[in-house]
Amino acid sequence: MMKTAVMFILVVVISLTYSSEEQEVARTYCGRHLANILAYVCFGVEKRGGAQYAPYWQETYLRSRKGPGVVDECCFRPCKLEVLKSFFFFFCD
């Protein structure tokens, strides 16, 4: 009986631990915030200034990618970090 109670409590605790893990929330990223999050994804740092990499990113994007852009995917509608990471090879060198 005692072993059953301990096992039950253990299962409940483990279940609560896994269910309480933070789920990534989709967010919108526009303007400077989009530039900052792209810099973070690319370089692992937060940018202090404006969009200093934006001209390079825009030029690379126009040459390399067909279809919806990062603004379409993450500014006009919410996106998750995984979507931003899918643009990694187009914005990060």
Curated annotation (Swiss-Prot):
Keyword Methyltransferase in record: no
Gene3D superfamilies given in the database record: Insulin-like
CDD domains assigned: IlGF_insulin_bombyxin_like
Signal sequence, start to end: 1-22
Localization in the cell: Secreted
Subunit details: Heterodimer of a B chain and an A chain linked by two disulfide bonds.
Function (record text): Brain peptide responsible for activation of prothoracic glands to produce ecdysone in insects.
Leftover remarks: Silk worm has two kinds of PTTH: 4K-PTTH and 22K-PTTH; there are many forms of 4K-PTTH.
Protein name: Bombyxin B-11
Gene source species: Bombyx mori
Gene (name only): BBXB11
